[in-house]
Regions:
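N-terminal small-residue-enriched
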Residues: 1-241
Length: 241
């Protein structure tokens, strides 16, 4: 870990020009959640599905995403702070597959939203002392791919690696739209990371970006203690400076 931090610090000290528009984009596990999964998960909530606010309404069983994507919520991962055997309504929890090889498999429901949608609770209720129960996530897991991140990067002539965003979540999340400044991102040139980009913005739509992806990495990292996510390479993202 220390050597990785030192390498990142060394690369970040070299400020380089923003890549050209239309170039490939790789998201780190952190960048993947902030940019694509955070707005996407809003549409899987039973609250929005039961009110017909989600663009996923009535589309269970349809192929809406790239077949490389398997995304699930698993409350039974050992030693995770988000794991639990029962949700906050006392319903037994289970692993819920949201996207299965690109197919929209299931939303996340508590008792109320499940009843409103003619569905059973998925054991996804969460609440605080200040709120009523509502659908929530536990451990978010995306299955790994077959190629290493080093091999993904080595195949890119010019591109960008997005790690952290500033102002994520400011777009219309129900539509999947996002637009944010890159607070930490790197330029890829001739298969190597050459430096850090500044004053750069990315925008696009999470559904479009996940509908046709290039690669998912074999490596996965833990994000915020309750997510296990890979690196993801897509082209359907706009870059501007």
């Amino acid at each position: 870990m220390v050597s990785e931090l030192c390498e990142e610090l060394s690369i970040a000290q070299n400020i380089v020009d923003t890549p050209k528009k239309g170039c490939p984009v790789i998201f780190t596990p952190h960048g993947l959640y902030q940019t694509l999964l955070s707005p996407l998960l809003v549409s899987f909530s039973g609250t929005n599905l039961s009110k017909n606010l989600s663009s996923l309404c009535g589309k269970e069983g349809e192929k809406l995403f790239d077949e490389k994507i398997i995304l699930s919520v698993d409350p039974h991962i050992d030693y995770s702070p988000a794991s639990r055997n029962y949700d906050d309504e006392g319903v037994v929890t289970k692993k819920n597959i949201l996207i299965n090889k690109g197919i929209f498999d299931s939303g996340l429901y508590d008792l109320k939203t499940g009843s409103e949608s003619s569905k059973k609770s998925t054991g996804s209720a969460g609440r605080s002392v200040h709120s009523n129960p509502s659908p929530t996530t536990s451990n978010i897991v995306m299955d790994e791919g077959q190629i290493t991140i080093n091999n993904i990067i080595s195949d890119i002539d010019e591109g960008i690696l997005v790690d952290h965003l500033l102002g994520a979540g400011q777009g219309n999340e129900l539509s999947g739209n996002f637009s944010a400044n890159i607070s930490l991102g790197y330029k890829i040139e001739k298969g190597e990371i050459i430096g850090r980009v500044k004053n750069t913005m990315i925008s696009g739509n999470a559904f479009d970006a996940l509908r046709d992806i290039e690669e998912i990495s074999f490596e996965r990292d833990q994000v915020y203690g309750s997510m296990m996510l890979p690196y993801l390479h897509t082209k359907n993202v706009e870059i501007s400076s």
